[in-house]
Amino acid sequence: DKSYFIFTNSIDLIYSIMTRLKVLDRSSVFCAPKSMDKLRQNKFIRCYDEWDKDNMRQYNFFTSRFFNAFDIELDVKPYLMMVTDVYFAEQTALDPFSDVIQIIGRFRNGVTSIEHITNVNYDLPQRSEEELCSFMDTSENVYETLRKFYDAAPNKGAREAYRAAMESLPFNRMLDRNGHKNWFAIDNYVNDALVIGYYHDNKSLHAAYL
């Protein structure tokens, strides 16, 4: 039988696919321990948190835990499929510039074919890198302005009010535990927003692949 390797970052979507296609008895899932617990609650036991080809079945599903940093060496060239459903689970959106390349790179002896099955959603925000950086700069300015008011607050009640306002701002998520700017978090925010934008329409996604 043909071997299929299917990558999608949603354990709920994986279980839905296996159920709808009636392949539960012919599938294995490679995922994080917490996801394994969820599958076992549904009486599915062929799930693993480490790759081992001895655990292969005809249909082999992988979450993002296995998108990189491990090699798949097989005597056969399987069919590679990547699945995105931006309505069901936005986290299944794959970056053609990184995720897709990393997934394909797992197969040291190549694959028979590569497919990315996806939908698009015109309601998803689509912003340029310049717009995202401008948003981040403005968010930082607003945060710093409130911090000045916080530092100059005349009493505890005022400080608590300013602190609550600061913690509600988008830029608060871009700080580390010491309150310093976290460049890694900022880069991730911008990149994730750009990737989601690719799935706004077919033309944008095709352009990202070219």
Predicted regions and their residues:
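Short glycine-/polar-rich loops that comprise or flank the Walker A/P-loop
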Residues: 25, 75-78, 109-114
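A short beta-strand element within the Helicase C-terminal
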Residues: 71-85
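Short acidic, S/G/P-rich loop/turn micro-motifs used as interaction or catalytic elements
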Residues: 11-14, 34-37, 65-70, 85-93, ...
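Conserved SF2 helicase motif VI
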Residues: 87-112
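Conserved two-lobed SF2 helicase motor
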Residues: 54-70
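Conserved helicase motor
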Residues: 9-11, 28-48, 63-66
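The feature captures the C-terminal accessory region of ATP-dependent helicases
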Residues: 132-210
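Conserved strand-helix element at the start of the C-terminal RecA-like helicase core
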Residues: 1-22
